[in-house]
Amino acid sequence: MSRLRKLFLMDEHTCPWWFVYTFDNPIRRLVQNPCAILRGLVKEGQTVVDVGCGAGYFSLALAELVGADGKVMGLDVQQRMLDIARRRAKRRGLDRSIEFRMCEPDSLGIEEPVDFVLAFWMVHEVSDRKAFLDEIKTFLRPSGLFLLVEPKVHVPLHRFEKTVELARLSGFEVEPGPKVWFSRSVVCSASASAVGQQP
């Protein structure tokens, strides 16, 4: 029961690399189409970051959306996840558009300004959510957007609302995000007008 609780319920943990195959498969595209979720938030030519990129499900879509003039950084704490993501990017011909990097559990290591940050189904794995949100605020451009998506099964409403409140305390303006199957989402921006500036 303890192992099942760690995987399916609310304990803080890092999703093991092998578990990605249970939900990162062709059927997922039917209910969580990455381009449909991200379109309207990401522009061609932007620099974007996929935090907790796992096997690259969203990183590949981000690379297609930002195009040849854009840049994608996929971050994860597990080397095996990054290895899978690199192989997938190479098969799709996107390996030159995406830089996959190992990051530390308490530091993302981004030193350049970025236009968009995605944290999909991973903030609940972070031990210090406030420090994590503070760090994102340091490298997100004033006009940039941060899409935060959490799974309903791991993150009950009260805990998601606490994360949203922490985002506000970190200086973000928060608005409802796109509808994502089995998830709750918000779009965070450094300024109140940033969401309206996007196409």
Enumerate the predicted regions with their spans.
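A short SAM/SAH-binding and catalytic strip from SAM-dependent methyltransferases
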Residues: 115-127
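A short acidic, Gly/Pro-enriched loop at the edge of an enzyme's catalytic core
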Residues: 103-117
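Class I SAM-dependent methyltransferase SAM/SAH-binding core
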Residues: 49, 55-107
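Core SAM-dependent methyltransferase catalytic element
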Residues: 170, 179-199
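A short glycine-rich, Lys/Arg-flanked "PGG" loop and its adjoining helix->strand segment in the class I
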Residues: 130-142
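Conserved beta-strand signature within the Rossmann-like core of class I S-adenosyl-L-methionine
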Residues: 143-150
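Conserved alpha-helix/loop element of class I SAM-dependent methyltransferases that forms part
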Residues: 28-46
